[in-house]
UniProtKB/Swiss-Prot annotation:
Transmembrane segments: none annotated. Its main location: nucleus. This is Period protein homolog lin-42. Residues 155-223 form the PAS domain. Transcriptional repressor which interacts with the promoter region of target genes. Has a specific role in developmental timing where it regulates temporal expression of a number of miRNAs and mRNAs. Controls temporal cell fate transition during embryonic and early larval development by restricting the expression of specific miRNAs, including let-7, miR-48, lin-4, miR-35 and miR-58. Restricts the accumulation of lin-29 in the hypodermis to the larval L4 stage, thus controlling terminal differentiation of seam cells. It comes from Caenorhabditis elegans. Disruption phenotype: Mutants exhibit a delay in development characterized by a strong molting defect, resulting in a prolonged L1 stage followed by an arrest in development in the L2 stage in most animals. There is increased expression of the heterochronic miRNAs, lin-4 and miR-48, in late L1. In addition, there is increased expression of the heterochronic miRNA let-7 at the L3 and L4 larval stages. Seam cell shape and connectivity is severely abnormal during the molt stages. Animals display a precocious alae phenotype, with the early formation of either full or partial alae in the adult cuticle. Residues 561-577 have a biased composition (Low complexity).
Length: 597
């Protein structure tokens, strides 16, 4: 079907099936629209855009070809200069495109149903021209509508008036300085297709003398931790035909919160003037014209500098804000807010005191405020000078000291606040002092101090006695221990043991170990055995408890010259136990003394 307004179109149509009675309808497109390619972009199915393009005489030709070979099935040309032999049936349409355009069309056919692609097409005169391709893909074929791209600065364009309209577009580049995105709407202004720039260096379309502007912008981005910064000067860009465009650029960066490095930089370029040179930025540059961009060797050097800046961690927040809050911290240390001068600060305090005071106190406050205001007027100049010094970059490590006038003013304010801290009632102030109501004071003598100290000591003593008594009352007392008497003891046995004398104390100057042993029953004393149980019992001593041999001696109990039974010495080394003399008190006592060899 021929679009409206183009009756002189030339058609080349071929029928795929030779049998006209059995037409084969085209298979419906069952694929859904997928992710768009970059730079290709999806376009709406509405015909409004197509009609606008047709009325604007941008329509060049339409073509239907097979996939993936690109054999032309039908074509129709609408623009002047396109003859019938430009696209004939059986020709290869993909051969009319540059290599990048061929790969993008085949990739878009596998991903979506409709796609908008920007590519350069070979014109009838053999020149490559940037065009817009509206593609509709089916299972084994594709229909392409080719629209011409025109310069935004061309006088033939109907949407360009005498007054220039400001245009803004966005570019993005990674930490390797490679462009990852550029608005396709910038094509009429730059003449560069997204396929010409994506993957290439940022400096590929920057005017060579303005490279330092890009470098300084990256340094400012690093210092501001990725916040928006403006270029120090207008950035000049080079169009496709070699013309120069002047634009105002703002930069912003994404900083990785873990590595603190800039990973992506976004630039917003605002073209605000006509190009310097040929206004047809879409056309190819004339032959023999030298490019205005940096040579590859110099461009690589600047790219390395930009990579170094972006791969360096940005300064921390505390370090960045140290200089920003330097002056405010100084003012806070001086005792008044940073954004209010000293005179206004004192006036505010005096106003609060006057409002909160009584009628009789207002006169006193006014007098004190007048004295403080005089010092405040002299301190305003000194405060401004100190703030000016504090806002400037610090040249020395020490802070500037406070001036004498400022210290005097602050002291007046403190005295004023101190005098108003404990206001007294007017009745008490006017009442005369009566000495009769108050007793005479006791003179401060040594006796008075002694009595005073004794009185406090008695109070402390009584207090501690009460505390100890309260603690003793809280603790429950345990009942006295009761010693049970053996069952087989008679009353006579109990009385006999009660009448026994206590054991004698050990002699002084010697180490003794006293051990009590159970006593024998009185009924067993009539036994024929004359030795006591203590004499018949052997006491084995484990050698593991003593590091050296030990011998037993009873020299402390026996009189001089006395020996044990049998004439054996206690230190003779025999295993027989020692024999003690039988006395009423020694029958219940065993005394041992340790002596090392």
């Amino acid at each position: 079907m021929e679009p409206a307004g183009h009756s002189s179109a030339t058609h080349n149509i071929v029928v795929p099936n030779a049998n006209p009675t059995q037409p084969q309808p085209l298979a419906p497109a069952m694929r859904e629209e997928g992710a768009t390619l970059s730079p290709p972009n999806t376009w709406s199915s509405s015909s409004v855009e197509f009609l606008d393009d047709a009325d604007d005489n941008r329509l060049l030709f339409t073509c239907t070809f097979t996939l993936p070979h690109g054999t032309v099935l039908s074509s129709a040309t609408y623009a002047d200069g396109f003859h019938e032999q430009y696209l004939t049936i059986g020709d290869n349409f993909l051969a009319r495109l540059e290599p990048k355009g061929q790969s993008f069309i085949l990739s878009a056919a596998a991903a979506s149903v409709k796609q908008r692609i920007f590519a350069r097409v070979t014109m009838p005169d053999g020149a490559l021209r940037a065009c817009e391709l509206l593609c509709e893909f089916e299972t084994d074929r594709a229909k392409i509508t080719v629209l011409a791209l025109r310069s935004a600065f061309s006088l033939q364009a109907s949407h360009v008036s005498s007054n220039f309209h400001v245009f803004t577009f966005i570019t993005k580049h990674s930490s390797t300085c490679a462009l990852t995105h550029i608005d396709y709407a910038s094509i009429p202004y730059l003449g560069l297709l997204p396929t010409d720039l994506i993957g290439k260096s940022l400096l590929a379309f920057v005017y060579s003398p303005d490279v330092h502007v890009v470098r300084q912008a990256h340094i400012d981005l690093h210092n501001s931790r990725g916040k928006i910064v403006k270029s120090i000067a207008d950035l000049r860009l080079v169009a496709h035909n070699g013309s120069i465009l002047r634009c105002q650029t703002e930069w912003s960066a994404y900083v990785n919160p873990w590595t603190r490095k800039m990973e992506l930089v976004v630039a917003r370029h605002r073209i605000c003037s006509l190009p310097i040179g040929d206004s047809d930025v879409i056309s190819s540059p004339p032959p023999g014209i030298q490019s205005n961009t940096l040579p590859p060797v110099m461009a690589k050097t600047f790219e390395d500098e930009l990579r170094t800046i972006m791969n360096k961690p940005v300064p921390s927040t505390s370090r960045h804000s140290h200089h920003h809050h330097h002056s405010s911290l100084k003012d806070q240390n001086q005792g008044f807010p940073a954004n209010i001068d000293l005179g206004a600060y004192i006036d505010k305090i005096v106003e609060q005191l006057v409002v909160n005071s009584t009628a009789q106190q207002q006169q006193k406050v006014a007098v004190a405020a007048a004295a403080a205001a005089q010092a405040a007027q002299a301190a305003v100049v000194a405060t401004a000078q100190i703030r000016k010094v504090a806002s400037a970059p610090p040249t020395t490590s020490t802070d500037p000291p406070l001036s004498y006038t400022q210290i005097n003013c602050l002291e007046n304010v403190h005295r004023l606040l101190k005098s108003q801290s404990r206001p007294e009632s007017p009745a008490k102030q006017d009442e005369p002092f009566d000495e009769k109501k108050y007793p005479p004071q006791t003179p401060l003598t040594r006796e008075a101090l002694t009595l005073h100290t004794k009185r406090f000591e008695d109070e402390y003593k009584d207090t501690w006695c009460r505390r100890l008594k309260r603690l003793s009352d809280d603790v429950p007392s345990s009942p006295p221990a009761k010693r049970t008497t053996p069952i087989h003891w008679t009353s006579s046995s109990q009385n006999h043991y009660r009448t026994m004398a206590p054991a004698p104390p050990p002699p002084p100057g010697k180490n003794y170990q006293i051990t009590y042993t159970p006593l024998d029953d009185l009924t067993d004393q009539k036994s024929t055995n004359t030795k006591s149980d203590v004499e018949n019992v052997a006491y084995p001593i484990s050698g593991s408890k003593f590091s050296t041999p030990m011998r037993l001696s009873i020299d402390g109990l026996l009189p001089r010259g006395a020996t044990s039974t049998g004439g054996a010495s206690p230190t003779s080394g025999t295993n027989s136990p020692p024999v003690f003399p039988k006395t009423s008190s020694s029958s219940s006592l065993l005394m041992l003394r340790d002596s090392q060899n």
